[in-house]
Amino acid sequence: MTDYPIKYRLIKTEKHTGARLGEIITPHGTFPTPMFMPVGTQATVKTQSPEELKAIGSGIILSNTYHLWLRPGDELIARSGGLHKFMNWDQPILTDSGGFQVYSLADSRNITEEGVTFKNHLNGSKMFLSPEKAISIQNNLGSDIMMSFDECPQFYQPYDYVKKSIERTSRWAERGLKAHRRPHDQGLFGIVQGAGFEDLRRQSAADLVAMDFPGYSIGGLAVGESHEEMNAVLDFTTPLLPENKPRYLMGVGAPDSLIDGVIRGVDMFDCVLPTRIARNGTCMTSEGRLVIKNAKFAEDFTPLDHDCDCYTCQNYSRAYIRHLLKADETFGIRLTSYHNLYFLVNLMKKVRQAIMDDNLLEFRQDFLERYGYNKSNRNF
């Protein structure tokens, strides 16, 4: 049996759904699952210190291979002692492969069997990223969990294109495994693609499971498809993945999508959503989203969320936070970002308890009713 640096321990499966309560053991510690991972694109979660992230309960954070490769450079980070030391974070780190960022540069990239040529978004220079290079960068960064280099096809691309894409992604995954220099202390995940086509998702999953990765990611979702389409893909994809290994749904952070992903057997999630909307003054609360810059909050001296015990809600009012944001004070963004991150991390804590109590479906219904979801208006 392979001795992986990343191990998944299943504690309990919820009686009425596919939801899993577990934990993931890494070289830099263990974190409970299901878990939402804050995104620290540039080796920092925007406006938050490592101490604040620990107070929030973030057991693991994500950093971005593409951005750190361009600036300050993976070799510089390696010389500093690795990403953990560079950013003063002693808990687990996951790095993506850079594939999604390259995918997002659709107008300036060229995909071949060897890899992807694209324009550096900082200075316009030509860059080349291959499966081997993506692994080399992540080996230099020293993250606990790494991603294979993949192509993320658009959800509605033609069948023939997606078929060729997943076959290439499988070949890239095999090349990445061979290039991996640190399998003893860095766990490499394979990424299942296939857009909305069930047979292609099956083919992609079968290819990757045969390669025996320590964990598996589900990619190519949250890229413009409907919530119902995402759930349908998860319904037929997660059962294809090994029960004894972690399952990671990439780029998902809306509360209803998190809960629905957990119901379908997903263990890990990440998204820039909580910090991105916080910078615009949008806050997640137990009763729905709150746009704090609105004039009606100018003299509202209550917390952002009456049911939240985070640092922001325990110490500051809506009126004060609105004032900070209207005055372009960074502290306002820090407070809203802290609250939104806490909200999602704490939501996952409540979800874990609901799995333990075998009442996740009831929890989902109660949460969504309070939050104000309906099909015509999916608030964050």
From Swiss-Prot:
<dbReference type="InterPro" id="IPR036511">
    <property type="entry name" value="TGT-like_sf"/>
</dbReference>
<comment type="similarity">
    <text>Belongs to the queuine tRNA-ribosyltransferase family.</text>
</comment>
<feature type="binding site">
    <location>
        <begin position="96"/>
        <end position="100"/>
    </location>
    <ligand>
        <name>substrate</name>
    </ligand>
</feature>
<dbReference type="InterPro" id="IPR002616">
    <property type="entry name" value="tRNA_ribo_trans-like"/>
</dbReference>
<dbReference type="GO" id="GO:0005829">
    <property type="term" value="C:cytosol"/>
</dbReference>
<protein>
    <recommendedName>
        <fullName>Queuine tRNA-ribosyltransferase</fullName>
        <ecNumber>2.4.2.29</ecNumber>
    </recommendedName>
</protein>
<dbReference type="GO" id="GO:0008616">
    <property type="term" value="P:queuosine biosynthetic process"/>
</dbReference>
<keyword id="KW-0328">Glycosyltransferase</keyword>
<dbReference type="GO" id="GO:0046872">
    <property type="term" value="F:metal ion binding"/>
</dbReference>
<keyword id="KW-0479">Metal-binding</keyword>
<feature type="region of interest" description="RNA binding; important for wobble base 34 recognition">
    <location>
        <begin position="275"/>
        <end position="279"/>
    </location>
</feature>
<keyword id="KW-0862">Zinc</keyword>
<feature type="active site" description="Proton acceptor">
    <location>
        <position position="96"/>
    </location>
</feature>
<feature type="active site" description="Nucleophile">
    <location>
        <position position="270"/>
    </location>
</feature>
<dbReference type="GO" id="GO:0008479">
    <property type="term" value="F:tRNA-guanosine(34) queuine transglycosylase activity"/>
</dbReference>
<feature type="binding site">
    <location>
        <position position="313"/>
    </location>
    <ligand>
        <name>Zn(2+)</name>
    </ligand>
</feature>
<dbReference type="GO" id="GO:0002099">
    <property type="term" value="P:tRNA wobble guanine modification"/>
</dbReference>
<dbReference type="Pfam" id="PF01702">
    <property type="entry name" value="TGT"/>
</dbReference>
<feature type="binding site">
    <location>
        <position position="150"/>
    </location>
    <ligand>
        <name>substrate</name>
    </ligand>
</feature>
<feature type="binding site">
    <location>
        <position position="193"/>
    </location>
    <ligand>
        <name>substrate</name>
    </ligand>
</feature>
<dbReference type="InterPro" id="IPR050076">
    <property type="entry name" value="ArchSynthase1/Queuine_TRR"/>
</dbReference>
<keyword id="KW-0808">Transferase</keyword>
<feature type="region of interest" description="RNA binding">
    <location>
        <begin position="251"/>
        <end position="257"/>
    </location>
</feature>
<keyword id="KW-0671">Queuosine biosynthesis</keyword>
<feature type="binding site">
    <location>
        <position position="310"/>
    </location>
    <ligand>
        <name>Zn(2+)</name>
    </ligand>
</feature>
<keyword id="KW-0819">tRNA processing</keyword>
<feature type="binding site">
    <location>
        <position position="308"/>
    </location>
    <ligand>
        <name>Zn(2+)</name>
    </ligand>
</feature>
<comment type="subunit">
    <text>Homodimer. Within each dimer, one monomer is responsible for RNA recognition and catalysis, while the other monomer binds to the replacement base PreQ1.</text>
</comment>
<dbReference type="GO" id="GO:0101030">
    <property type="term" value="P:tRNA-guanine transglycosylation"/>
</dbReference>
<dbReference type="InterPro" id="IPR004803">
    <property type="entry name" value="TGT"/>
</dbReference>
<feature type="binding site">
    <location>
        <position position="220"/>
    </location>
    <ligand>
        <name>substrate</name>
    </ligand>
</feature>
<feature type="binding site">
    <location>
        <position position="339"/>
    </location>
    <ligand>
        <name>Zn(2+)</name>
    </ligand>
</feature>
<comment type="pathway">
    <text>tRNA modification; tRNA-queuosine biosynthesis.</text>
</comment>
<comment type="function">
    <text>Catalyzes the base-exchange of a guanine (G) residue with the queuine precursor 7-aminomethyl-7-deazaguanine (PreQ1) at position 34 (anticodon wobble position) in tRNAs with GU(N) anticodons (tRNA-Asp, -Asn, -His and -Tyr). Catalysis occurs through a double-displacement mechanism. The nucleophile active site attacks the C1' of nucleotide 34 to detach the guanine base from the RNA, forming a covalent enzyme-RNA intermediate. The proton acceptor active site deprotonates the incoming PreQ1, allowing a nucleophilic attack on the C1' of the ribose to form the product.</text>
</comment>
